[in-house]
Regions:
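A short, N-terminal "cap"/entry segment at the start of jelly-roll beta-barrel domains
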Residues: 1-34
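Short, surface-exposed charged micro-motifs
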Residues: 27, 55, 81, 91
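A generic structural motif
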Residues: 29-31, 66-68, 93, 106
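Conserved short histidine dyad/triad with adjacent acidic residue
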Residues: 29-51, 81-86
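Short histidine-centered beta-strand/loop micro-motifs
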Residues: 38-40, 46-51, 67, 73-75, ...
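Short, conserved beta-strand element in jelly-roll/cupin
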Residues: 50-65
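Short acidic-glycine-tyrosine-enriched beta hairpin
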Residues: 70-90
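Ligand-binding loop in jelly-roll beta-barrel domains
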Residues: 85-108
């Protein structure tokens, strides 16, 4: 099931813009203090580093990802999630001509 809305949040109004605008996100804080980000990745191939573990939830579009040390790319589309260990890296790509990848990043 895809998350369609999140109630009772505080939104950081200043966007986080990465990779020349290919990835744009906003930080959110839930009423219980839990932090997440919601964003979009436009067609591109990008590499990210994590501090804390993350769960990436696709809420629209699709991407392929490859975790650090993995050989194969894995597809993720709306309603699917993938986990990224803390203190690691992962690659993500959205193919040209495909819809943007819309996501919620759940921090551990």
């Amino acid at each position: 099931m895809t998350t369609e809305k999140i109630d009772n949040i505080t939104v950081q109004t200043q966007a986080n813009v990465y990779f020349g605008g290919k990835c744009i996100s906003h930080g959110i804080t839930l009423a219980d203090g839990t932090k997440k980000s919601v964003g979009v990745i436009l067609p591109a191939s990008l590499s990210f580093s994590t501090g804390a573990a993350e769960v990436m939830e696709c809420v629209g579009g699709a991407c392929e990802y490859k975790l650090s040390g993995a050989d194969d790319w894995v597809m993720s589309s709306a309603g699917e999630r993938f986990s990224v260990p803390g203190n690691s890296t992962f690659d993500i790509r959205v193919a040209p001509g495909f819809d943007a990848y819309h996501y919620i990043c759940h921090f551990a």
